[in-house]
């Protein structure tokens, strides 16, 4: 038996990963390839395609359910208000979860290598390999390393009789998981092109209809919908269906990829939009001004690491230390209204609210704790003093 006995391949059953199967044997010298498909909320049709293709290739095929782990990571992202250039990181967060699951199978099956079918232009190659290169297994990227083109893959599949009908997987490149659905490619790559309505599956065009829902949080984690406790996966799936019917969660952005490429991306993410908006509204109620300002910096750094797929980085641990310190007060409920394609917070309640109705009222003389309105006179005199002084100095100098 050779030193290169078995390799675990991230397997979708699509063109890229299908041609990788024989190439890993012919070009890299592996005796056996095993395919691993990780469930992070893809459509059932994708698993059927992977299973049928694996069977046609006589490929040992493993399916791993990682939806619970992925949902937990998504809720960590909610606590960090995680978003990258308007995108709630669905694909980015899924990749390290998928990579970890594949690595675990590879070790259990005695593999000496792990492989993926990502190209050398995208982000996924980096996210997968950031996890895998922390192991002692060989990391292989046939599409990137062999410089494969779409045309070559189609011709190669046809010559070898690989189970790819026409070598065409559809007009657009689509990635779906619990947290988001991305649509890219073809005419959508042109920034000036107006996408047709039929690119969307999770969301419908907004109408005049509205709906209000109540989202409950404990320690910053979403835990309930309209008073009913739900597990993370069920809560996300329910909100995707519910909010999607009101057109909530569409994003059309120019995204700066990790390798410096600027690309156009279209996303659908109803549940993510609702939960992120609700969480931010509750934080605004319970955190102090200074905490809110500093947490924006922490959230930004967490989002950058999340986009890079580096959710296990030491920096993320440190950032989450601060986040944990703030989230024990992010407990309460937020009422969200679906209206015109938006998920708008219209009410929020918490026992930790940093708010005093008496102090904020225009109908009371006292502010709070024995402080009266007239006590603000001294503060008002000093406020802006340095700026006034600076302007006088500047004006005097200009007159000379």
UniProtKB/Swiss-Prot annotation:
Binding-site list for L-aspartate: 119, 123-124
InterPro entries attached to this UniProt entry: Arginosuc_syn_C, Arginosuc_syn_N, Arginosuc_synth, Arginosuc_synth_CS, Arginosuc_synth_type_1_subfam, AS_cat/multimer_dom_body, Rossmann-like_a/b/a_fold
Signal peptide coordinates: none
Localization per Swiss-Prot or TrEMBL: Cytoplasm
Domain of life: Archaea
Family annotation (CDD domains): ASS
GO-annotated molecular function: argininosuccinate synthase activity; ATP binding
PROSITE patterns (alphabetical): ARGININOSUCCIN_SYN_1 (PS00564), ARGININOSUCCIN_SYN_2 (PS00565)
Pathway assigned to this chain's UniProt record: Amino-acid biosynthesis; L-arginine biosynthesis; L-arginine from L-ornithine and carbamoyl phosphate: step 2/3
Annotated positions binding ATP: 10-18, 117
Annotated EC: 6.3.4.5
Residues involved in L-citrulline binding: 87, 123, 127, 173, 182, 255, 267
Gene Ontology cellular component annotations, sorted alphabetically: cytoplasm
Subunit structure: Homotetramer.
NCBIfam families the UniProt entry points to: argG (TIGR00032), PRK00509.1 (NF001770), PRK13820.1 (NF010392)
Protein name as catalogued: Argininosuccinate synthase
């Amino acid at each position: 038996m050779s030193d290169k006995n078995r390799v675990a391949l991230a397997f979708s059953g699509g063109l890229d990963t299908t041609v990788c199967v024989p190439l890993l044997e012919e070009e890299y010298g592996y005796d056996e390839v095993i395919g691993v498909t990780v469930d992070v909320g893809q459509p059932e049709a994708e698993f059927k395609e992977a299973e049928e293709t694996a069977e046609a290739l006589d490929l040992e095929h493993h399916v791993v359910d990682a939806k619970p782990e992925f949902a937990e990571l998504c809720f960590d992202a909610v606590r960090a208000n995680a978003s990258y250039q308007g995108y709630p990181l669905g694909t980015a967060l899924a990749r390290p979860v998928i990579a970890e699951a594949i690595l675990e199978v590879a070790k259990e099956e005695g593999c000496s290598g792990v492989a993926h079918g990502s190209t050398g232009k995208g982000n996924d190659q980096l996210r997968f390999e950031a996890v895998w290169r922390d192991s002692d297994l060989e990391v292989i990227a046939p599409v990137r390393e062999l410089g494969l083109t779409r045309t070559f893959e189609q011709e190669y599949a046809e010559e070898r009789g690989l189970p790819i009908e026409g070598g065409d997987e559809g007009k657009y490149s689509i990635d779906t998981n619990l947290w988001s659905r991305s649509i890219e490619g073809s005419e959508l790559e042109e920034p000036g092109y107006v996408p047709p309505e039929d690119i969307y599956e999770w969301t419908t065009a907004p109408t005049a209809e509205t709906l209000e829902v109540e989202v409950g949080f404990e320690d910053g984690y979403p835990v309930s919908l309209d008073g009913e406790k739900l597990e993370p996966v069920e809560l996300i799936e329910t909100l995707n269906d519910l909010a999607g019917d009101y057109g909530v969660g569409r994003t059309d952005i120019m995204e700066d990829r990790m390798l410096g490429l600027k690309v156009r991306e279209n996303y659908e993410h109803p549940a993510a939009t609702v939960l992120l908006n609700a969480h931010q509204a509750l934080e605004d109620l319970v955190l102090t001004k200074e905490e809110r300002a500093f947490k924006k910096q922490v959230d930004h750094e967490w989002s950058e690491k999340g986009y890079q797929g580096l959710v296990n980085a030491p920096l993320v641990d440190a950032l989450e230390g601060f986040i944990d310190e703030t989230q024990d007060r992010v407990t309460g409920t937020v009422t969200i209204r679906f209206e015109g394609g938006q998920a708008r917070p219209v009410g929020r309640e918490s026992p930790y609210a940093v708010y005093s109705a008496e102090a904020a009222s225009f109908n009371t003389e006292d502010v709070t704790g024995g402080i009266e309105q007239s006590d603000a006179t001294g503060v008002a005199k000093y406020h802006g003093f340095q700026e006034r002084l600076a302007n006088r100095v500047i004006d005097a100098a200009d007159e000379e």
